[in-house]
Amino acid sequence: MKITIYFFLLLLSFTINSVSATVQKFNFFDLNKQLNIFLKKEYPLNEDSIKIIIHTPLKKNIYCRKPDFSILSNTHNLGLINILLTCSKQHYYLTVEVQSEGEYIVANRKIPRGTRIKESDLKILIGRLDVLPNNTYRKKKDVVNRISLREFFPLQPITSFMTRPFWLVKVNQQVTVIINGNNFKMSSKAKSLSNGAQNQNIRVKTNSGKIINGIINENGEVIVSP
Protein backbone atom coordinates (compact mmCIF):
# COMPACT_ATOMS: atom_id res chain seq x y z
CA MET A 1 0.00 0.00 0.00
CA LYS A 2 2.80 2.40 0.93
CA ILE A 3 4.58 1.58 -2.32
CA THR A 4 1.40 2.32 -4.30
CA ILE A 5 0.93 5.67 -2.54
CA TYR A 6 4.60 6.52 -3.11
CA PHE A 7 4.37 5.87 -6.84
CA PHE A 8 1.09 7.82 -7.05
CA LEU A 9 2.65 10.87 -5.37
CA LEU A 10 5.73 10.58 -7.58
CA LEU A 11 3.58 10.44 -10.70
CA LEU A 12 1.48 13.39 -9.49
CA SER A 13 4.62 15.46 -8.82
CA PHE A 14 5.98 14.67 -12.27
CA THR A 15 2.67 15.64 -13.89
CA ILE A 16 2.48 18.97 -12.02
CA ASN A 17 6.08 19.84 -12.93
CA SER A 18 5.43 18.99 -16.57
CA VAL A 19 2.29 21.15 -16.68
CA SER A 20 4.10 24.00 -14.92
CA ALA A 21 6.97 23.85 -17.41
CA THR A 22 4.50 23.81 -20.28
CA VAL A 23 2.64 26.83 -18.91
CA GLN A 24 5.86 28.76 -18.41
CA LYS A 25 7.03 27.96 -21.91
CA PHE A 26 3.66 28.90 -23.37
CA ASN A 27 3.52 32.19 -21.48
CA PHE A 28 7.05 33.14 -22.56
CA PHE A 29 6.24 32.27 -26.16
CA ASP A 30 2.93 34.16 -26.00
CA LEU A 31 4.66 37.26 -24.58
CA ASN A 32 7.04 37.39 -27.55
CA LYS A 33 4.16 36.82 -29.92
CA GLN A 34 2.10 39.62 -28.34
CA LEU A 35 5.07 42.00 -28.53
CA ASN A 36 5.45 41.27 -32.24
CA ILE A 37 1.74 41.92 -32.82
CA PHE A 38 1.91 45.20 -30.86
CA LEU A 39 4.94 46.53 -32.73
CA LYS A 40 3.60 45.63 -36.15
CA LYS A 41 0.50 47.67 -35.33
CA GLU A 42 2.65 50.58 -34.15
CA TYR A 43 4.77 50.41 -37.32
CA PRO A 44 2.25 49.89 -40.16
CA LEU A 45 4.83 49.62 -42.94
CA ASN A 46 2.54 47.70 -45.29
CA GLU A 47 4.57 45.38 -47.49
CA ASP A 48 7.85 46.08 -45.71
CA SER A 49 9.65 43.23 -44.00
CA ILE A 50 9.88 43.72 -40.22
CA LYS A 51 12.19 41.93 -37.81
CA ILE A 52 12.02 42.42 -34.05
CA ILE A 53 14.95 41.63 -31.74
CA ILE A 54 14.49 41.74 -27.95
CA HIS A 55 17.75 42.88 -26.32
CA THR A 56 16.41 42.56 -22.77
CA PRO A 57 16.00 38.84 -21.97
CA LEU A 58 12.51 38.00 -20.72
CA LYS A 59 12.30 35.65 -17.75
CA LYS A 60 10.62 32.41 -18.68
CA ASN A 61 8.61 32.39 -15.45
CA ILE A 62 6.78 35.63 -16.25
CA TYR A 63 3.05 34.93 -16.30
CA CYS A 64 1.12 37.62 -18.11
CA ARG A 65 -2.49 36.92 -19.02
CA LYS A 66 -3.05 40.33 -20.67
CA PRO A 67 0.29 42.05 -21.42
CA ASP A 68 0.09 45.81 -21.95
CA PHE A 69 2.88 47.42 -24.00
CA SER A 70 3.71 51.10 -24.43
CA ILE A 71 6.57 52.79 -26.27
CA LEU A 72 8.56 55.13 -24.01
CA SER A 73 8.96 57.83 -26.64
CA ASN A 74 6.82 60.27 -28.60
CA THR A 75 8.53 59.34 -31.86
CA HIS A 76 8.07 56.05 -33.69
CA ASN A 77 11.55 55.67 -35.10
CA LEU A 78 12.97 52.37 -36.22
CA GLY A 79 16.08 50.91 -34.58
CA LEU A 80 16.48 50.67 -30.80
CA ILE A 81 13.42 51.61 -28.77
CA ASN A 82 12.43 51.28 -25.11
CA ILE A 83 9.16 49.58 -24.21
CA LEU A 84 7.27 49.35 -20.93
CA LEU A 85 5.58 46.01 -20.34
CA THR A 86 2.87 45.98 -17.68
CA CYS A 87 1.66 42.66 -16.28
CA SER A 88 -0.99 43.27 -13.62
CA LYS A 89 0.93 45.51 -11.20
CA GLN A 90 4.39 44.46 -12.34
CA HIS A 91 6.44 46.64 -14.72
CA TYR A 92 9.25 45.48 -16.99
CA TYR A 93 11.46 47.71 -19.14
CA LEU A 94 12.52 46.21 -22.45
CA THR A 95 15.02 47.33 -25.05
CA VAL A 96 13.83 46.21 -28.46
CA GLU A 97 15.37 46.63 -31.91
CA VAL A 98 12.96 47.09 -34.81
CA GLN A 99 14.55 46.29 -38.15
CA SER A 100 12.70 46.86 -41.40
CA GLU A 101 13.51 46.42 -45.07
CA GLY A 102 11.73 48.22 -47.88
CA GLU A 103 11.92 50.77 -50.70
CA TYR A 104 13.32 54.27 -50.26
CA ILE A 105 14.31 57.18 -52.51
CA VAL A 106 17.85 58.26 -53.42
CA ALA A 107 19.32 60.73 -55.89
CA ASN A 108 19.91 59.18 -59.31
CA ARG A 109 22.54 61.78 -60.15
CA LYS A 110 24.18 64.87 -58.70
CA ILE A 111 21.40 67.40 -58.08
CA PRO A 112 22.42 71.05 -57.56
CA ARG A 113 20.87 73.18 -54.86
CA GLY A 114 17.70 74.97 -55.97
CA THR A 115 16.72 72.34 -58.55
CA ARG A 116 13.08 71.53 -59.18
CA ILE A 117 13.26 67.76 -58.85
CA LYS A 118 12.05 65.55 -61.71
CA GLU A 119 11.21 61.86 -61.58
CA SER A 120 14.33 61.06 -63.64
CA ASP A 121 16.44 62.62 -60.87
CA LEU A 122 15.31 59.89 -58.48
CA LYS A 123 15.97 56.22 -57.99
CA ILE A 124 14.33 53.55 -55.83
CA LEU A 125 16.53 51.29 -53.71
CA ILE A 126 15.60 48.42 -51.40
CA GLY A 127 17.40 48.09 -48.09
CA ARG A 128 17.37 48.50 -44.32
CA LEU A 129 15.04 51.36 -43.37
CA ASP A 130 16.10 51.43 -39.71
CA VAL A 131 19.63 52.60 -40.59
CA LEU A 132 18.45 55.49 -42.81
CA PRO A 133 18.11 59.13 -41.69
CA ASN A 134 14.74 60.06 -40.19
CA ASN A 135 12.03 61.12 -42.66
CA THR A 136 13.69 59.54 -45.68
CA TYR A 137 11.27 59.61 -48.61
CA ARG A 138 9.65 56.30 -49.55
CA LYS A 139 7.72 57.32 -52.70
CA LYS A 140 8.88 59.24 -55.79
CA LYS A 141 5.61 61.18 -55.97
CA ASP A 142 6.40 62.78 -52.61
CA VAL A 143 9.63 64.29 -53.99
CA VAL A 144 8.79 65.19 -57.60
CA ASN A 145 8.36 68.97 -58.16
CA ARG A 146 9.92 69.85 -54.81
CA ILE A 147 12.99 72.11 -54.60
CA SER A 148 16.35 70.84 -53.33
CA LEU A 149 17.64 72.90 -50.40
CA ARG A 150 21.19 71.58 -50.81
CA GLU A 151 23.31 69.64 -53.25
CA PHE A 152 22.45 65.94 -53.52
CA PHE A 153 25.03 63.31 -54.42
CA PRO A 154 24.34 60.13 -56.41
CA LEU A 155 22.68 57.38 -54.31
CA GLN A 156 22.25 59.75 -51.34
CA PRO A 157 18.98 59.09 -49.44
CA ILE A 158 16.66 62.11 -49.69
CA THR A 159 14.82 63.30 -46.60
CA SER A 160 12.01 65.81 -46.11
CA PHE A 161 14.50 68.17 -44.44
CA MET A 162 16.43 68.42 -47.71
CA THR A 163 13.58 69.76 -49.85
CA ARG A 164 10.83 72.37 -49.82
CA PRO A 165 7.66 72.81 -51.86
CA PHE A 166 7.76 74.57 -55.22
CA TRP A 167 6.26 78.00 -54.59
CA LEU A 168 3.46 78.78 -57.03
CA VAL A 169 2.97 82.03 -55.14
CA LYS A 170 5.73 84.13 -53.58
CA VAL A 171 5.53 86.71 -50.83
CA ASN A 172 4.34 90.18 -51.97
CA GLN A 173 3.28 88.77 -55.35
CA GLN A 174 0.13 90.11 -57.02
CA VAL A 175 -2.28 87.20 -57.35
CA THR A 176 -5.77 86.64 -58.65
CA VAL A 177 -8.32 85.94 -55.94
CA ILE A 178 -11.45 84.03 -56.97
CA ILE A 179 -14.34 84.19 -54.52
CA ASN A 180 -16.97 81.48 -54.85
CA GLY A 181 -20.26 82.37 -53.20
CA ASN A 182 -23.84 81.21 -53.31
CA ASN A 183 -24.87 81.56 -56.97
CA PHE A 184 -22.07 83.99 -57.76
CA LYS A 185 -18.38 84.11 -58.57
CA MET A 186 -16.09 87.12 -58.61
CA SER A 187 -12.38 87.79 -58.97
CA SER A 188 -10.02 90.56 -57.90
CA LYS A 189 -6.35 91.24 -57.31
CA ALA A 190 -4.54 90.95 -53.99
CA LYS A 191 -1.03 90.77 -52.56
CA SER A 192 0.22 87.52 -51.02
CA LEU A 193 1.58 87.74 -47.48
CA SER A 194 3.73 84.59 -47.69
CA ASN A 195 5.06 81.93 -50.02
CA GLY A 196 2.69 79.13 -50.95
CA ALA A 197 2.54 75.85 -52.85
CA GLN A 198 -0.36 74.17 -54.62
CA ASN A 199 -3.24 73.22 -52.29
CA GLN A 200 -1.74 75.21 -49.42
CA ASN A 201 -3.66 77.79 -47.43
CA ILE A 202 -2.37 81.34 -47.86
CA ARG A 203 -3.25 84.79 -46.55
CA VAL A 204 -3.61 87.67 -49.01
CA LYS A 205 -4.28 91.40 -48.63
CA THR A 206 -6.85 92.98 -50.93
CA ASN A 207 -6.56 96.47 -52.42
CA SER A 208 -9.01 97.67 -49.78
CA GLY A 209 -6.71 96.41 -47.03
CA LYS A 210 -8.79 93.40 -46.02
CA ILE A 211 -6.88 90.18 -45.19
CA ILE A 212 -8.49 86.94 -46.34
CA ASN A 213 -7.51 83.27 -46.52
CA GLY A 214 -7.71 80.99 -49.52
CA ILE A 215 -6.34 77.85 -51.16
CA ILE A 216 -3.81 78.02 -54.00
CA ASN A 217 -4.90 76.11 -57.10
CA GLU A 218 -2.70 74.62 -59.85
CA ASN A 219 -2.70 77.95 -61.71
CA GLY A 220 -1.42 79.97 -58.78
CA GLU A 221 -4.82 81.54 -58.13
CA VAL A 222 -6.21 81.88 -54.62
CA ILE A 223 -9.64 80.30 -54.23
CA VAL A 224 -11.85 81.64 -51.44
CA SER A 225 -14.93 79.65 -50.51
CA PRO A 226 -17.62 80.53 -47.95
Swiss-Prot record:
GO cellular component terms, A-Z: periplasmic space
Cited InterPro entries: Flag_basal_body_FlgA_C, Flagellar_FlgA, SAF
Chief location bin: periplasm
Protein name: Flagella basal body P-ring formation protein FlgA
Function: Involved in the assembly process of the P-ring formation. It may associate with FlgF on the rod constituting a structure essential for the P-ring assembly or may act as a modulator protein for the P-ring assembly.
Single GO BP term: bacterial-type flagellum assembly
Subcellular location as annotated: Periplasm
Keyword ATP-binding assigned: no
Alphabetized NCBIfam families for the sequence: flgA_cterm (TIGR03170)
Family in the record: Belongs to the FlgA family.
Signal peptide bounds: 1-21
Keywords attached to this entry: Bacterial flagellum biogenesis, Periplasm, Signal
Domain of life per record: Bacteria
SMART domains: SAF
